[in-house]
Swiss-Prot record:
Belongs to the methyltransferase superfamily. Tam family. This is Trans-aconitate 2-methyltransferase. The gene is tam. One of its GO terms (biological process) is methylation. Keywords: Cytoplasm, Methyltransferase, S-adenosyl-L-methionine, Transferase. It comes from Methylobacterium sp. (strain 4-46).
Length: 257
């Protein structure tokens, strides 16, 4: 995929940061020495970590140059590293690995979570939040439009960009086997947006990227118009024109024994 767009992502900065704050609130650590923000994006979650743990050595890691440029401008005193999470290995065992809205882009969660858990210092925590919305209308309709002419051939692989999440039982079993105690929960946020275009703008910064990147500008516009029309049928507006977007997310905090 093309590089991420920090400005597009931050159009909904408050809504995207709230789950990170909710995840951090459940991390049972008082004074970790080493904290790594995996998939730190533009630094919104990193700022929360720095505020919660002011004495920790906090590192932000991301594969997007655009996201990292924004993060470095926001938090010049923090160390940010450009790296692919799939092959990342820390120099020293971290006390906290914090992964807000990033692991859904990576495959093999059984192997991935076991590998991350093994990186932790004894007593350390892996804290993860992932969107769990692939069966919401916002995402089902992406796939439906992608399967229609004239997009189908070019977007045949787009739906595979996101990993389908496991069940609570799966994540508990995988992390328990890796020597962790596990705290799991699921929350559905309900976001009021300014019409159906608001949903388009939201997912354009994340979930729509695999569907738009293979298309030229004219076909992108055609795809978005058809997608927005489908959203209008799936999300009836409120009396004042607002549209409510339910957004389920899966959370886990695993602590190494």
């Amino acid at each position: 995929m093309a590089d991420w767009n920090a400005a597009q992502y931050l159009k909904f900065a408050d809504e995207r940061t709230r789950p990170a704050a909710d995840l951090l609130a459940r991390v049972p650590l008082e004074s970790p020495a080493r904290v790594i923000d995996l998939g730190c994006g533009p630094g919104n979650s990193t700022a929360l970590l720095c505020a919660r743990f002011p004495r920790a050595a906090v590192t932000g890691l991301d594969s997007s140059p655009d996201m990292l440029a924004t993060a470095r401008e926001r938090l010049p005193a923090v160390r940010f590293v450009e790296a692919d999470l799939a092959g990342f290995t820390p120099a020293e065992p971290p006390d906290l690995l914090f992964a807000n809205a990033v692991l859904q882009w990576l495959p093999d969660h059984a192997g991935l979570l076991a590998r991350l858990a093994r990186m932790l210092a004894p007593g350390g925590c892996l804290a993860v939040q992932m969107p769990d919305n692939l069966e919401e209308p916002s995402h089902r309709l992406m796939r439906r439009v992608a399967g229609e002419a004239p997009f189908a051939e070019r977007l045949a692989q787009a739906a595979a960009a996101r990993t389908r999440l496991g069940s609570f039982r799966d994540y508990d079993a995988w992390l328990s086997a890796a020597g962790c105690t596990v705290d799991l929960w699921r929350t559905t946020y309900v976001h009021p947006l300014a019409g159906h275009r608001g949903i388009v703008e939201w997912v354009r910064g994340t979930g729509l990227r695999p569907f738009l990147d293979p298309l030229d500008p004219a076909d992108q516009a055609a795809f978005l118009a058809r997608y927005e029309a489908a959203l209008a049928e799936a999300y009836p507006p409120q009396a004042d024109g607002r549209v409510l977007l339910p957004f389920p997310r899966l959370f886990l905090v695993a602590r190494r024994r």
